[in-house]
Amino acid sequence: MEFSPCIVRTKEPMQALAEIVAKARQAVSAAPDLPTLDELRVRYLGKKGELTGHFKALDQVSAEERPIFGKAVNEAKQALQSEIEARRKDLEQAALEARLASEAIDVTLPGRGLDVGGLHPVTRTLARIEAFFRYAGFEIHEGPEVEDDYHNFEALNIPPSHPARAMHDTFYFDAHTLLRTHTSPVQIRVMEHQGPPLRIIAPGRVYRCDSDLTHTPMFHQVEGLLVDEQVSFTDLKGILSDFLRAYFEREDLEVRFRPSYFPFTEPSAETDIQCVNCSGEGCRVCGHTGWLEVLGCGMVHPKVFEHVGIDSERYLGFAFGLGVERLAMLRYGVNDLRLFFENDLRFLRQFN
């Protein structure tokens, strides 16, 4: 918008100057925004502004009053410029506050939920098992999942005619290389490099050709070994009973040992616990027997010691093996082993 300069000829120049200054100050103080303020600055202080135009009124003033009038016009321009700058700062601050207010986050509003991860039930179960045996003085050892026939079978007194060597039970790469069917080879490797006394557990993945409600081609095992002088089956029963009662958090849990057969232990036993679902009354989970089979165990066979160079006349030992998924199913009430490997978040979130 362009304004014509105002040259007052009917009023005294000083009076006209005072009126314009008063009008300008009032307009500046009432300016609602920065664009309006800029228009006022141009209107009054621009090259063709109303205050600037008053310099042309100097010829209406006597020579004696001309310096006084010129000084008054300059002072009026400076004062108005200061008021415009002050008003500009106020408007800029108000605009900043308005913008901040519009961008403010209302912390009282409900937030967006975050997906929080958690430990897999098999991982939780492994951690509980390892914690108990670490407390009992056992070391944790690991070994290769791709094994040779010697460490997986022969060194464990499993003859070539044993069913475990059949193609339908074992994943073979060639005649001498396979995916380990248990973590017992770790025990052989440790005994080959460390002498007694030994207390170790070997957790890890194992592989067998099997798949149904209670079996998968890949699952987790923890196998344990203790070798020392004067070791008895009573020691084996004591450590396993303590473990099972600690794992299921039941001091009154009944544990029984049944005679069994494993080629790498003699004598051998299957370990059962009172059904944790029905407390021994009989239900679908335990097949109405009141008992659940949970692990196998026994005293280390002398031929196993011979393969690793340990004197079986001086040293005795016991070994045991348990399925991690089996214990997880019993602890968490899961009836299908395959659920652990389907990556269904609806299932997994129940444990976090």
Curated annotation (Swiss-Prot):
GO molecular function list: ATP binding; magnesium ion binding; phenylalanine-tRNA ligase activity; tRNA binding
Name the record gives this protein: Phenylalanine--tRNA ligase alpha subunit
Gene: pheS
InterPro entries according to UniProt: aa-tRNA-synth_II (IPR006195), aa-tRNA-synth_II/BPL/LPL (IPR045864), Phe-tRNA-synth_IIc_asu (IPR004529), Phe-tRNA_ligase_II_N (IPR004188), Phe_tRNA_ligase_alpha1_bac (IPR022911), Phenylalanyl-tRNA_Synthase (IPR002319), tRNA-bd_arm (IPR010978)
Record's cofactor remark: Binds 2 magnesium ions per tetramer.
Quaternary structure annotation from Swiss-Prot or TrEMBL: Tetramer of two alpha and two beta subunits.
Binding site for Mg(2+): E266
Gene Ontology cellular component terms for the protein in this record: cytoplasm
The family this protein is said to belong to: Belongs to the class-II aminoacyl-tRNA synthetase family. Phe-tRNA synthetase alpha subunit type 1 subfamily.
PANTHER family for this protein: PHENYLALANINE--TRNA LIGASE, MITOCHONDRIAL, PHENYLALANYL-TRNA SYNTHETASE
Stored Gene3D superfamilies: Bira Bifunctional Protein, Domain 2 (3.30.930.10)
Organism: Nitrosococcus oceani (strain ATCC 19707 / BCRC 17464 / JCM 30415 / NCIMB 11848 / C-107)
Disulfide bond sites: none
Enzyme nomenclature, EC number: 6.1.1.20
UniProt subcellular location: Cytoplasm
Cofactor annotation: Mg(2+)
CDD domains according to UniProt: PheRS_alpha_core (cd00496)
GO biological processes: phenylalanyl-tRNA aminoacylation
Enzymatic reactions: tRNA(Phe) + L-phenylalanine + ATP = L-phenylalanyl-tRNA(Phe) + AMP + diphosphate + H(+)
